[in-house]
């Protein structure tokens, strides 16, 4: 077997065999555990519930209804007359009507407070492709980007794996709700300089994944001023722009650039990554967008986009749907309402058993605080707790360490990729796990919390002796899952 591995490595490239992909991180290992034992209400009611998938399935019925009412929007139905034109080779600039519809949709998701030029819209194969393409445009192997942590685990794949760049965390702390501070940004930059690492830019995810929080104007202005002062790029990943379900509203970096006091900024250093995967719930369509204020970057990204184009059929369909302003307005309004309702239901269910989450107003997930359940404040203890949740409680949640969080005990848990019934089953499992059954318990909420703290504040393994020989996701032979956000 060793000979086979050595032989394989010798005939493949270093890029193909390096470990920068991040596939073996706990974030993706949770996916493997789910794949090996997926929950189904009838076929496998005791299976693992997928709560590691940041997917928005709450409004797909609205899209289905639109398709039924607009059969000409698809070449598979009444739009068949357009089949030949769509099947032919297309310029990688993209269909003009598609780019126009995307620009208009980006404006609507930002409250109509900013305008986007369709000529600056560049296509890519999902946000994954868009993020990698923008890095290829801006940096060389060995260069680095600063990224506030905790941050999306698959950035290692999207931004590092094939580009050869480094990611340097800007450490944020729970003491101020993980807000980005000027001090932390400066410290990360200066440490890189001392190590002779060339910093080419800073990457913001706004709204944040995994925090589900939005950045205020002051923070955006501060970061923008810093990047301009040091002549480095600012890449804003805004793929969760329309997932805001509570105040404060989302503020795009494009809005900051439009403000009078920021006219001195060099717009050539600012770039936006967008997608329809989260806001519309269409990750399978693989629609990623690069929007740059730099002409050279637009031209370069457009040439590179030939490696990851959006299919013409997809462009045709989306151009029709997103051009329906009445539909878009209703969709965005209904999506925000449903996300808010689901978030409230889920977080209230956690609060009943004393589990708190970081206060958030956006996203498809919560940043869940399980620090009281750790035996000790270490990442080893976090991983032990995570294994119990995966193998015993049968929930795939993502440990904070995979998001480069510096404090053990935080977990990202997704709530928008399932129906109401599955959410309730997940909450019931959590209640059983912490020893507080809602049914038959007539004590007050405060008494429940006190009892929970008394009995379960420090996770005891005496009743659930964890046998390391039990299948661990880390050693699972299950093939890798599709690596999605």
UniProtKB/Swiss-Prot annotation:
The record's GO molecular-function terms, alphabetically, read: 1-aminocyclopropane-1-carboxylate synthase activity; pyridoxal phosphate binding; transaminase activity
Q: Supply the InterPro entries for this chain.
A: Aminotransferase_I/II_large, Ethylene_sulfur-biosynth, NHTrfase_class1_PyrdxlP-BS, PyrdxlP-dep_Trfase, PyrdxlP-dep_Trfase_major, PyrdxlP-dep_Trfase_small
Q: Does the keyword Manganese apply?
A: no
| Enzyme Commission number, as recorded | 4.4.1.14
Pfam families under this entry?
Aminotran_1_2 (PF00155)
Q: Which EC class does it fall in?
A: lyase
Catalytic activity, as annotated: S-adenosyl-L-methionine = 1-aminocyclopropane-1-carboxylate + S-methyl-5'-thioadenosine + H(+)
Q: What induces it?
A: Hormones, such as auxin, environmental factors, such as mechanical wounding and a number of chemicals.
Q: Which UniProt keywords apply?
A: Ethylene biosynthesis, Fruit ripening, Lyase, Phosphoprotein, Pyridoxal phosphate, S-adenosyl-L-methionine
Phosphoserine: modified positions: 460
Q: In which pathway does it act?
A: Alkene biosynthesis; ethylene biosynthesis via S-adenosyl-L-methionine; ethylene from S-adenosyl-L-methionine: step 1/2
Which cofactors does this gene product need? pyridoxal 5'-phosphate
Q: How is it modified after translation?
A: Phosphorylated on Ser 460; phosphorylation may regulate its turnover.
What GO biological process terms are annotated to this protein in UniProt?
A: amino acid metabolic process; ethylene biosynthetic process; fruit ripening
N6-(pyridoxal phosphate)lysine occurs at 278
Mutation: residue 92 to F; reported impact is: Loss of function; when expressed alone in E.coli. Partially complemented; when coexpressed with another ACS2 protein mutated on K-278
Say which domain of life the source belongs to.
Eukaryota
Q: Which residues bind substrate?
A: 55, 92
Entry's family note = Belongs to the class-I pyridoxal-phosphate-dependent aminotransferase family.
Q: Sum up the protein's function in the record's words.
A: 1-aminocyclopropane-1-carboxylate synthase (ACS) enzymes catalyze the conversion of S-adenosyl-L-methionine (SAM) into 1-aminocyclopropane-1-carboxylate (ACC), a direct precursor of ethylene.
* Subunit structure comment from the entry: Homodimer and heterodimer. In vivo, the relevance of heterodimerization with other ACS enzymes is however unsure.
Q: Miscellaneous notes for this chain?
A: The stability of ACS proteins, and the regulation of such stability, play a central role in ethylene biosynthesis.
- Name of this protein: 1-aminocyclopropane-1-carboxylate synthase 2
- Per the record, the gene is ACS2
